Amino acid sequence: MNYGLTGLARAKARAKRWYHQLFKAIFGSRPVQWSKWVQNTYILHLEERTDRFHALNKELSKIKTTKGTLADEVTWFPALRDVEHWPAGEHIDEYSFEFHWAIDPDPWFYDHIDELADQTIDCSHAETAISLGHIRMWRQFLESDAEVAMFLEDDVYFDYQFEQKITSIFEKELPEDWDILYLGALPNYHGFTWDPHSKNLIRLYNGVWWMSSYVLTRSAAEKLLDNLPIVGPVDVWINYQFEYLNAYMTPGNLITQTGMTDSDNTYSFVQEYY
């Protein structure tokens, strides 16, 4: 999801990607022990988006692991499109203004909050499909014998220091009781709350968008599925789950959205209020 990447932000993302590609070419990288830390890697992918498949597969091939490259260790998970029917216990495709605003309390709405709070917003078809896609990936993870899994959307690229920083994070910095690790996220302007933790990690409490690059433990996936349905967009709902998840985040994205391809998502809150 490219929430927030429009105009100048998209141009900056493209420039940053070029910068990272240049530095990666200059300095190279060392193989990482990926399967030691993350046993399964899933990519939520619309099969007709062959442009994204080729771009991300090329990116993954640059990440060297002790088994080859990261491209050799991923599962391309088919995304849904234009879903009209799904189990009632999985997703509620409407949410209130207050449900979103509590995560990102934009002061622009203060004078009208009483009249806006209970207004209902319908999710876009894409938001529903994405939410259901993440649920299905979590379930497939739990059907495996893996203890840790990474989940990607198909429009991302890797920071040129990814290998160095991810090694430090998994070997030295993550506490034993972690549940979810964001390797890329978009902090919102008004609700982002966190504490410092270590050189490459912060402890996250609230206020991030994107579900395009994150890592879950098995117990975290179980907790998320136990707390279904997802209400509204998954990257809004997940913030409410931090109450029982030990959430961490890299303060500078190690994996970020490219801004290079057109988004297949429509953002219901943005369409309704901005």
Predicted features and spans:
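An acidic/histidine-cluster motif and surrounding catalytic segment
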Residues: 3-152, 156-274
